[in-house]
Amino acid sequence: MSGQRAAKRRTGDLHTEFPTSCGNPYQTACLLSKFIELPTPPLTRHQLKRLEEHRYQSCGKSLLEPIMQGFWEWLVEQVPQWIAPNLITIIGLLINIITTVVLVYYCPTATEKAPTWTYLSCAIGLFIYQSLDAIDGKQARRTNSSTPLGELFDHGCDSLSTVFVVLGTCIAVQLGTNPDWMFFCCFAGMFMFYCAHWQTYVSGTLRFGIIDVTEVQIFIIIMHLLAAIGGPTLWLSMIPVLNVPMKLFPALCTVAGTVFSCTNYFRVIFTGGVGKNGSTIAGTSVLSPMLHIGSVIVLATMIYKKSSVQLFEKHPCLYILTFGFVSAKVTNKLVVAHMTKSEMHLHDSAFIGPALLFLNQYFNSFIDEHLVLWIALVLSFIDLIRYSVSICNQIASHLHIEVFRIKTKVARFNHH
């Protein structure tokens, strides 16, 4: 998720044989993943072929990345070479998610004070995720196991982590007392991550700025540590000169960061893409990705504002997670569209959950909105998991590799 990905370059070496079995130690997990998979493979043969031709390109370096590189280089040397890069990534993501879910349990409305250890665990969890996310690409090169699946898996985990990171930050500063600000901060974070890959879809190059995700993550770690040390009193204190509560400081930083980042993203997008006549890398309109993230944000805003029972105000964490899973799904599809040089289609099963909420409100909420929100949350989560498992398994099968294990003999060719 961070600027260190510029050094990862996990788009490596391909082969197209198909595996004959899952392997006995992993047979149960393999059967489970087959059960979860979509009935129809998400990628066509032509998309898989273009995936083989994909090359990772990035430019730019964030402010703290050179400082952190020494630590990351040391850390990857401590990892056994039999551990797969994707396994490192998923472990970091699970730690990040679990620590945030614990915080959500104690603060379901983002207004409560959680035990001190929960804030500390979130800070540690995010640091672990940042560190493991930084070394997975290094481990891939170190073990000679770089593939396009690694890049996709990395970005996919980042898209989900973004949801939990922004939610955890809002809980840490008790932003639930200001629901409009909490709504803005969470969806601004998702939107900026989407835009980073939108401009990549247009230009073919992932760009990193001076202030990028590494810096933002460290800022959020500090927020969690302050929450552990200062508690509610800290966030109620007023900021001199600005005369606003301390809890709005992260929100104001989000506004500034959104304006700065989106200005850079849209400058690239509106300059024109690398495709024919200034189109995207897939030859589509540079504005076409707006429909997907725009639909997520518009639906979320309408349901929030039209709710007769203050659905978002009373259940902000459930609400953010529901739409966060939808946002993660469409972001993943954007990354896939870039890597396979293909068009994004607007119709998507990810929108079933939000559609249920919208239709329920349209018919005067004849079903309890809280119940429908839970249904939408479950549907959105299952849809994201099924898509993610399906596409990872399909690509792994096509490249004759395994998602979480390093195969000893892999046919390779130069990707540089």
Swiss-Prot record:
Glycans are attached at residue 144. GO terms for cellular component: endoplasmic reticulum membrane; nuclear membrane. Mg(2+) 2 binds at residues 133, 154, 158. The keyword Zinc does not apply. It is a multi-pass membrane protein. Pathway: Phospholipid metabolism; phosphatidylethanolamine biosynthesis; phosphatidylethanolamine from ethanolamine: step 3/3; Phospholipid metabolism; phosphatidylcholine biosynthesis; phosphatidylcholine from phosphocholine: step 2/2. It is found in: Endoplasmic reticulum membrane; Nucleus membrane. Keywords: Endoplasmic reticulum, Glycoprotein, Lipid biosynthesis, Lipid metabolism, Magnesium, Manganese, Membrane, Metal-binding, Nucleus, Phospholipid biosynthesis, Phospholipid metabolism, Transferase, Transmembrane, Transmembrane helix. Its main location: endoplasmic reticulum. GO terms for biological process: phosphatidylethanolamine biosynthetic process. Gene3D superfamilies: 1.20.120.1760. Its EC number is 2.7.8.1, 2.7.8.2, 2.7.8.22. Its cofactor is Mg(2+); Mn(2+). The record marks 151 as: Increases basicity of active site His. GO terms for molecular function: 1-alkenyl-2-acylglycerol choline phosphotransferase activity; diacylglycerol cholinephosphotransferase activity; ethanolaminephosphotransferase activity; metal ion binding. This is Choline/ethanolaminephosphotransferase 1. It comes from Xenopus tropicalis. The gene is cept1.
